[in-house]
């Protein structure tokens, strides 16, 4: 067992590191001993690189771990023997703590065998390896690692009391001038071995850290090299693409040049063909001129005859087309010219527009466009109220006259295409009425009239048809002069349109009743009230809902289509003659 411990490099390193820690922490160390250890540390740094030392330490550590696993069983017994011997040694050293002694004398006594201590106290130390073996192992470890491991608190504070380590150097080299007391020796335990194995990972960890840093630097260098290669590869590909693009551009330039040459060649060929054709034509003309005889005359006469036949056929077709166009134009002309009733309607609608745009100007409604509209329609209808009332009076007279139906068949001037009797005047009036309705000028005028009324209760008796002759009193408002005039204007309007509806057979069931109603309203009372205004508004709404104006327009259009055209009558007269 002792032979295995003496041959183990781990045990020698343990003693060398323990001596270094004792040297760093004990105040009794002599300068000579420090000089000796300094010489050993300087010898360990002889031209060895850090990588070689780290590799050697790693190999020795692997050997130590292998031997440790092999000697676990034997070391337990040795530790028990060491504990027993150290107990005896501590008992024998206690009297010598206060006695002056020197390390040199102790070393000499131990070397000569005349030590007063029992032999069993230093028996394990005599089996330790030689100082040269410890020195050789210390040379393999860098001085910076030894100093760092020796200076750590974890190494120096493994036990509460420092354990004396015998000097590994020969006694003749140790010289101590001042005597120092030997510190008490506590029984060492297995912590001494643990302290060694705790120190080994610190060296190994630094070596591993250096290895990691070196491997990281190598990895980073490899990555940079790969990136550099990738960039070079991309650059090479870009250069290849550029070369290919230049080659393509040159090819395209060549193709364009060849196409230009081909186009120029084709143009030259076409010009040559044209020149050849012209020469042929000239030759044919010369040949025709040279020919003489009757054949040419016969051919020319036949061609002329065929041409004349073709011209006659085309002339007949053109004549038919002209007749159809004339017929369509006559029909269009008849439809574009307004009848007398339609002309009266156009005039009355102009009066309506002139009146309400004048009221809009008077009351400040649509002030931006009202003056221009009032000026335009006033030129076409200077007296709107008088014209509407006169038209209503004529309608009243015609409704009483049974022969008034012949009025719609009055003569029509077909030459009046550019005057007031064409359909454009009707279209302009309809557009003006739609503009008036969209701007709600009529509603604004009615609202202003309602705001200007004076409240006056008028006892107005209204007979109730459902009350069997009973009468009831309803409050009514007296209207102003402007509003009374407006009500009279609307009553005349309703009278005129219902009179025309009666004449043309539009809404036969109610037309007669409405005509008599508005005739009685317009001539039956001397004073107009708010009830009359409401009745007039209801009458206008009824007129719009039933579409009386649209029905009258369609009836007049049907009458125009039924009238015979002047050209047809002329054809009949020619046929009779």
Curated annotation (Swiss-Prot):
It is a peripheral membrane protein. InterPro entries: SCD2-like. One of its GO terms (cellular component) is clathrin-coated vesicle. Residues 1-42, 67-214 are annotated as: Disordered. Residues 73-83 have a biased composition (Acidic residues). Disruption phenotype: Defects in seedling development, root elongation, leaf expansion, flower morphogenesis and fertility due to defective cytokinesis in epidermal cells. Its main location: membrane. It is found in: Cell membrane; Cytoplasmic vesicle, Clathrin-coated vesicle. Residues 101-116 have a biased composition (Low complexity). Residues 206-337 form a coiled coil. One of its GO terms (biological process) is cytokinesis by cell plate formation. Residues 15-28 have a biased composition (Polar residues). Keywords: Cell cycle, Cell division, Cell membrane, Coiled coil, Cytoplasmic vesicle, Growth regulation, Membrane, Phosphoprotein. The keyword Cell division applies. Residues 205-214 have a biased composition (Basic and acidic residues). Expressed in the mature region of the primary root, tips of short, young lateral roots, guard cells in the epidermis of cotyledons and rosette leaves, the socket cells surrounding the base of trichomes and hydathodes of fully expanded rosette leaves. The modification Phosphoserine is found at residue 130. It comes from the Eukaryota. Disulfide bonds: none annotated. Involved in growth and development through its role in cytokinesis and polarized cell expansion. Required for plasma membrane internalization. May function in clathrin-mediated membrane trafficking, including plasma membrane endocytosis, essential to both cytokinesis and cell expansion. This is Coiled-coil domain-containing protein SCD2. The gene is SCD2.
């Amino acid at each position: 067992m002792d032979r295995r411990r003496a041959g183990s490099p781990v045990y020698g390193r343990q003693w060398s590191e323990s001596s270094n820690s004792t040297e760093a922490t004990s105040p009794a160390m002599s300068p000579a001993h420090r000089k000796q250890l300094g010489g050993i540390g300087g010898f360990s740094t002889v031209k060895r690189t850090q990588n070689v030392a780290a590799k050697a330490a790693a190999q020795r550590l692997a050997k130590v771990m292998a031997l440790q696993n092999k000697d676990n069983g034997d070391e337990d017994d040795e530790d028990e023997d060491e504990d027993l011997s150290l107990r005896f040694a501590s008992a024998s050293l206690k009297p010598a703590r206060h006695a002056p002694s020197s390390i040199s004398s102790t070393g000499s006594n131990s070397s000569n065998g005349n030590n007063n201590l029992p032999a069993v106290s230093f028996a394990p130390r005599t089996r330790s390896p030689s100082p040269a073996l410890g020195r050789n192992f210390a040379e393999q470890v860098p001085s910076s690692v030894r100093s760092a491991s020796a200076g750590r608190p974890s190494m120096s504070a493994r036990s509460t009391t420092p354990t004396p380590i015998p000097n590994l150097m020969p006694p003749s080299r140790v010289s101590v001038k001042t005597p120092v007391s030997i510190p008490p020796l506590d029984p060492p335990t297995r912590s001494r071995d643990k302290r060694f194995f705790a120190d080994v990972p610190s060296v190994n960890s630094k070596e591993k850290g250096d290895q990691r840093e070196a491997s990281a630097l190598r990895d980073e260098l490899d990555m940079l090299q790969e990136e550099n290669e990738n960039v070079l590869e991309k650059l090479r590909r870009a250069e290849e693409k550029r070369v290919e693009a230049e080659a393509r551009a040159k090819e395209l330039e060549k193709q364009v040049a060849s196409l230009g040459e081909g186009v120029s060649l084709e143009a030259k060929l076409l010009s040559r063909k044209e020149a050849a054709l012209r020469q042929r034509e000239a030759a044919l003309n010369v040949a025709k001129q040279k020919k003489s005889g009757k054949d040419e005359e016969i051919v020319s006469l036949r061609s002329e005859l065929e041409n004349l036949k073709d011209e006659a056929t085309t002339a007949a077709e053109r004549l038919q087309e002209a007749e159809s166009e004339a017929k369509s134009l006559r029909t269009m002309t008849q439809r574009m010219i307004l009848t007398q009733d339609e002309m009266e309607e156009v005039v009355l609608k102009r009066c309506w527009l002139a009146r309400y745009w004048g009221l809009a100007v008077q009351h400040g409604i649509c002030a931006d466009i009202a003056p221009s509209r009032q000026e335009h329609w006033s030129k076409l209808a200077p007296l709107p109220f008088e014209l509407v009332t006169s038209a209503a009076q004529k309608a009243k007279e015609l409704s009483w006259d049974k022969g008034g139906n012949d009025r719609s068949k009055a003569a029509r001037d077909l030459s009046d295409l550019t005057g007031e009797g064409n359909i454009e005047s009707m279209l302009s009036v309809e557009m003006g009425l739609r503009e008036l309705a969209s701007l709600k000028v009529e509603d604004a005028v009615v609202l202003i009239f309602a705001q200007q009324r004076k409240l006056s209760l008028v006892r107005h008796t209204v007979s109730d048809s459902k009350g069997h002759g009973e009468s009831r009193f309803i409050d009514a408002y007296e209207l102003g002069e402007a509003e009374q005039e407006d009500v009279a204007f609307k009553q005349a309007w309703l009278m005129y349109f219902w009179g025309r509806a009666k004449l043309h057979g539009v809404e036969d069931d109610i037309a007669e009743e409405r005509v008599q109603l508005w005739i009685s309203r317009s001539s039956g009372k001397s004073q107009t009230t708010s009830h009359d205004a409401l009745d007039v508004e209801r009458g206008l709404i009824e007129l719009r809902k039933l579409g009386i104006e649209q029905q009258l327009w369609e009836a007049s259009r049907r009458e125009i289509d039924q009238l015979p055209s002047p050209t047809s009558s002329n054809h009949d007269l020619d046929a009779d003659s």
